[in-house]
């Protein structure tokens, strides 16, 4: 067993060996290394063919048409292109956008930029379970609302939004629906034929593909128009210029094909391991799962251990690669904005750890994790005066702390 044990699959995944092998065939002189836009010789034709195969593989994963897939550098770029692209193209129709406070920074920061450009954004607050109620979403809709951007699976707490209901509501109001599927694509089924979603952000490195590659699904019927954010060459039907990274795209395509093939088996294994982990630590006093218990993806599991500092816990769990929030924000000592939006106080938000389980996690690793977590919590609480006061029956909410 390799230490530290990797339990941070929501931050990134290792490239599946089947994907890496396929990518290696598209990098060197002996492989298919040409520029897919080179139409005058075989090197270009072969590269274009490899890109076409990958485009079909990504489309198959979500039951889309291959012409609806636009390759990007990742889900962050996809979300930027989707949100800004819609806002800029349809600005005469309206300048109001709806999103939620628990979205990824790729969505939130893009919306903040649009606010600086004169757009209005409504940031919905979820219920304590992390889910946006449909009536709250509908109440926020206005005549000038052009876009709703809600993530499928939350990257910190793993809750799943009802995208079918959101899609139906948006379509009935003539509002475009963008979905950030960075954490869900390749892990839970997505079918664009039955779900009325117009734009989907997809990430390669969250589904055992390479970093630096992603895709944006752009619906053709009814047709969605975007204003390009990257100019120079008119690649990807004018939506995203730049030489196509053949080996990366092939990697994304193969990752999508493997994910589709292994999805049911992966899901069953990951659910088993998540249940095993929770059953092994739920006896620890003052331990709480964050987010809805039912409507969730089993691979992301966020737990608060009351009366323990998250940072000290992470130091104690040095044998486990885990995070105290999303990788994009765990470098900050601020409590998770996602957990704060759920109504958790600073102490509970600070004492939370995100465990994310993936394709290569083993039973042995989970056993070791349970032992490490249990021992670390006991040790840290032994040193905690707050824990001692709590055990003595003192209501810490009522304590008046002296300021120095």
From Swiss-Prot:
Q: Which residues are annotated as modified residue N6-(pyridoxal phosphate)lysine in the UniProt record?
A: 206
What pathway does this protein act in? Cofactor biosynthesis; iron-sulfur cluster biosynthesis
Q: What is its main location?
A: cytoplasm
Keyword Iron on this protein?
yes
One GO process term, biological-process aspect? [2Fe-2S] cluster assembly
Determine if Iron-sulfur is one of this entry's keywords. Answer: yes
What are the catalytic residues?
A: 328
The cofactor required is: pyridoxal 5'-phosphate
Instruction: Spell out the GO cellular component terms annotated for this protein, sorted alphabetically and separated by semicolons.
Output: L-cysteine desulfurase complex
> What Gene3D superfamilies does this protein map onto?
Aspartate Aminotransferase, domain 1, Type I PLP-dependent aspartate aminotransferase-like (Major domain)
Keywords attached to this entry: 2Fe-2S, Cytoplasm, Iron, Iron-sulfur, Metal-binding, Pyridoxal phosphate, Transferase
Enzyme class comes to transferase
Protein's cellular compartments: Cytoplasm
GO molecular function, a single term: cysteine desulfurase activity
Please give the InterPro entries that the UniProt record associates with this protein. Aminotrans_V_dom (IPR000192), Aminotrans_V_PyrdxlP_BS (IPR020578), Cys_deSase_IscS (IPR010240), Cysteine_dSase (IPR016454), PyrdxlP-dep_Trfase (IPR015424), PyrdxlP-dep_Trfase_major (IPR015421), PyrdxlP-dep_Trfase_small (IPR015422)
The EC number(s) given in the record are 2.8.1.7
| UniProt: pyridoxal 5'-phosphate binding residues | 75-76, 155, 183, 203-205, 243
For this protein, what reaction is catalysed? (sulfur carrier)-H + L-cysteine = (sulfur carrier)-SH + L-alanine
UniProt-annotated binding residues for [2Fe-2S] cluster: 328
- What is this protein for, i.e. what is its function? Master enzyme that delivers sulfur to a number of partners involved in Fe-S cluster assembly, tRNA modification or cofactor biosynthesis. Catalyzes the removal of elemental sulfur atoms from cysteine to produce alanine. Functions as a sulfur delivery protein for Fe-S cluster synthesis onto IscU, an Fe-S scaffold assembly protein, as well as other S acceptor proteins.
Q: How does it assemble?
A: Homodimer. Forms a heterotetramer with IscU, interacts with other sulfur acceptors.
What's this protein's family per the entry?
Belongs to the class-V pyridoxal-phosphate-dependent aminotransferase family. NifS/IscS subfamily.
Q: What is this protein called?
A: Cysteine desulfurase IscS
Protein species of origin: Shewanella frigidimarina (strain NCIMB 400)
Q: What is the lineage of its organism?
A: Bacteria, Pseudomonadati, Pseudomonadota, Gammaproteobacteria, Alteromonadales
């Amino acid at each position: 067993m390799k230490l530290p044990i990797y339990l941070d699959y929501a931050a990134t995944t290792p490239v599946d060996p089947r994907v890496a092998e396929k990518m290696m065939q598209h990098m060197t002189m002996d492989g298919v290394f040409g520029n897919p836009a080179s139409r005058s010789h075989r090197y270009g034709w072969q590269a274009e063919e490899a890109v076409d195969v990958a485009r079909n593989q990504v489309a198959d994963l979500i039951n889309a048409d291959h012409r609806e897939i636009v390759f990007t550098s990742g889900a962050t770029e996809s979300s930027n292109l989707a949100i800004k692209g819609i806002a800029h193209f349809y600005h005469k129709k309206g300048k109001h956008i709806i999103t939620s406070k628990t979205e990824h920074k790729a969505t939130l920061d893009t919306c903040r930029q649009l606010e600086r450009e004169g757009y209005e954004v409504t940031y919905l607050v979820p219920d304590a379970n992390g889910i946006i109620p449909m009536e709250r979403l509908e109440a926020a809709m206005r005549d000038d609302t052009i876009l709703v951007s809600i993530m499928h699976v939350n990257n910190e707490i793993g809750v799943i939004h009802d995208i079918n209901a959101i899609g139906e509501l948006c379509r009935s109001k003539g509002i475009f629906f963008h979905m950030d599927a960075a954490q869900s694509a390749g892990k839970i089924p997505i079918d664009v034929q039955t779900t009325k979603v117009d734009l989907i952000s997809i990430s390669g490195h969250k589904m055992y593909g390479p970093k630096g590659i992603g895709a944006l699904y752009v619906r053709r019927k009814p047709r969605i128009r975007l204003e390009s954010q990257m100019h120079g060459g008119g690649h990807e039907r004018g939506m995203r210029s730049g030489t196509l990274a053949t080996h990366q795209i092939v990697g994304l395509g193969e990752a999508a094909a493997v994910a589709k093939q292994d999805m049911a088996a992966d899901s069953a294994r990951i659910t088993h391991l998540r249940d095993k982990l929770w059953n092994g630590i739920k006896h620890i006093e003052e331990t709480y799962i964050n987010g809805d218990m039912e409507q969730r993806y089993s691979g992301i599991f966020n737990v608060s251990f009351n009366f323990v500092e998250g940072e000290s816990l992470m130091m104690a769990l040095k044998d486990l690669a885990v995070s105290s929030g999303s990788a994009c924000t765990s470098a900050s000592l601020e409590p998770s904005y996602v957990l704060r939006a759920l109504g958790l106080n600073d102490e509970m938000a600070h004492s939370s750890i995100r465990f994310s389980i993936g394709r290569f996690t083993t039973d042995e690793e989970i056993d070791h994790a349970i032992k490490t977590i249990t021992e670390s919590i006991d040790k840290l609480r032994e040193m905690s005066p707050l824990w001692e006061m709590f055990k003595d029956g003192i209501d810490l909410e009522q304590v008046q702390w002296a300021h120095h």
